[in-house]
């Protein structure tokens, strides 16, 4: 049966810190599906309860909720309970990958390279000198479970470390303090198990923060960014990382080079942005996907 005969909901918005980005992504996805002739409805989950989707006649979901329940397995579990197929990763992969700490533990357990880190939990005494002695300066401080660089700080001096940790703790009870990786930054999309060309990110500012991602027009995206050998190298690493955490459908994996040019894994985005600034469509375009066809392909991979 053609998916065009089904009633499809684009779930977007929601209540996470990434609501605004999700609203933009949802609008783009909704318009793309509409233009292709799908029977589609845009539903902001802040306004409409998920458990009533079945009553509304919804038969399939395109999930474009960033962060929060849209990416942590809660939505996925609810949709499985309702018997509604959905785009993107399943319950387990969603739950694991929204937690950067546990994602890195898994990768490290199978020998995949990541930045060295220290973990700080809410209420724990922090010894700045000890952390800096171990990881050096500058450092990155980030909440374990937020996306879109919400709550992330670059720390250049010892005095900045505690305030940065306090800021990150506003968003999560677990905070990661990571070594600075001095090399280039890449984001690597995966579509149906196929690794697409890496996109190099040259941020407008100190690092790829919320402003550089969504507001600035001066952040540069270079794609394809790597020669064939380096692309093959990063693709092998990214595919291993994707498989270890159990991703399916589509995801985007962020990677950085260290000072020696070795690739290190950073994090997984199981529900990548689909706005005018977004990385996934930029990469997919280089291998022949229009935005509309990319959206349709993600929908076709729903399960």
Curated annotation (Swiss-Prot):
One of its GO terms (cellular component) is cytosol. The keyword GTP-binding does not apply. It is found in: Cytoplasm. It catalyses: 2 D-alanine + ATP = D-alanyl-D-alanine + ADP + phosphate + H(+). Pathway: Cell wall biogenesis; peptidoglycan biosynthesis. Pfam families: Dala_Dala_lig_C, Dala_Dala_lig_N. One of its GO terms (molecular function) is metal ion binding. Its cofactor is Mg(2+); Mn(2+). Keywords: ATP-binding, Cell shape, Cell wall biogenesis/degradation, Cytoplasm, Ligase, Magnesium, Manganese, Metal-binding, Nucleotide-binding, Peptidoglycan synthesis. Residues 104-300 form the ATP-grasp domain. This is D-alanine--D-alanine ligase. It comes from Glaesserella parasuis serovar 5 (strain SH0165) (Haemophilus parasuis). The gene is ddl.
């Amino acid at each position: 049966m053609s998916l065009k005969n089904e009633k499809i909901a684009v779930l977007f918005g929601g209540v996470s810190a990434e609501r605004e980005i999700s609203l933009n992504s949802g609008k783009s996805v909704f318009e793309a599906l509409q233009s292709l002739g799908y029977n589609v409805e845009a539903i902001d989950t802040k306004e409409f309860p998920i458990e009533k989707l079945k009553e509304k006649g919804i038969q399939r979901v395109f999930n474009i909720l960033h962060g929060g329940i849209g990416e942590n397995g809660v939505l996925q579990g609810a949709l499985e309970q309702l018997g509604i197929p959905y785009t993107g990763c399943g319950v387990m992969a969603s739950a694991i990958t929204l937690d950067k700490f546990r994602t890195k533990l898994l990768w490290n357990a199978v020998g995949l390279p990541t930045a060295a880190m220290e973990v700080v939990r809410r209420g724990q005494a922090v010894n700045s000198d000890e952390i800096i002695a171990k990881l050096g300066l500058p450092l990155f401080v980030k909440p374990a479970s937020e996306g879109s660089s919400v709550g992330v700080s670059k720390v250049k001096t010892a005095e900045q470390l505690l305030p940065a940790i306090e800021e990150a703790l506003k968003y999560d009870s677990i905070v990661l303090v990571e070594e600075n990786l001095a090399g280039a930054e890449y984001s690597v999309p995966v579509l149906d198990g196929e690794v697409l060309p890496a996109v190099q990110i040259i941020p407008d500012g100190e690092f790829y923060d919320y402003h550089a991602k969504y507001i600035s027009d001066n952040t540069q995206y270079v794609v394809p960014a790597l020669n064939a050998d380096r692309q093959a190298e990063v693709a092998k690493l990214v595919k291993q990382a994707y498989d270890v955490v159990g991703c399916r459908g589509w995801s985007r994996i962020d990677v950085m080079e260290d000072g020696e040019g070795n690739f290190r894994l950073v994090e997984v985005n199981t529900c990548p942005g689909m706005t005018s600034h977004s990385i996934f469509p930029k990469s997919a375009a280089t291998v022949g996907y229009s935005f509309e066809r990319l959206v349709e392909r993600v929908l076709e991979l729903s399960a």
